[in-house]
């Protein structure tokens, strides 16, 4: 297997780690009828990055990167004494969302579309298990749908922009 440490894999790890940390460091922002969890600004990019890693190094390396990032973020959560539910929520949402993106992309769905679908799956699981009263409680039940909508909107907008920039300048 060829060496796979490059800008995409490093960014993938950084985005995932920072996305996990900002969840506890900052509270969600409410803008009108929607609530935007802090991880919204970062985690959407991990879905685009995993497709770039798959293009550059193949399916096995992209799978390995998903598991590496899961292990690193779980370790960080445990070391920082985050609640076990936050660790589990993060892990479950991340793995299901990333593998959804990877699988759709493998079967021919566009980079942007597969990333967006994976993000929606990730967000639903993450907000439900991690941010709601089941998890750390930063999103009360009455704001649940607004938080999912807020995170999905931010991630989809950012992914759409990033996908267009990538297609225009890096393809």
Can you describe what each PLM-predicted range is?
Residues 1-56, 60:
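Hydrophobic transmembrane alpha-helices
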Residues 7-9, 60-70, 110-113:
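Cytoplasmic-side transmembrane-helix entry/capping segments in multi-pass membrane proteins
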Residues 16, 69-73, 119:
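Residue-level recognition of pore/gate-forming positions within transmembrane alpha-helices
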Residues 17, 21, 51-52, 74, ...:
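Alpha-helical transmembrane segments of multipass membrane proteins
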Residues 23, 27, 32-36, 73-93:
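Interfacial aromatic-anchored transmembrane helix boundaries in multi-pass membrane proteins
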Residues 47, 65, 150:
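Pore-lining transmembrane helices
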Residues 83-171:
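Membrane-embedded alpha-helical hairpins and interfacial helices in multi-pass inner-membrane proteins
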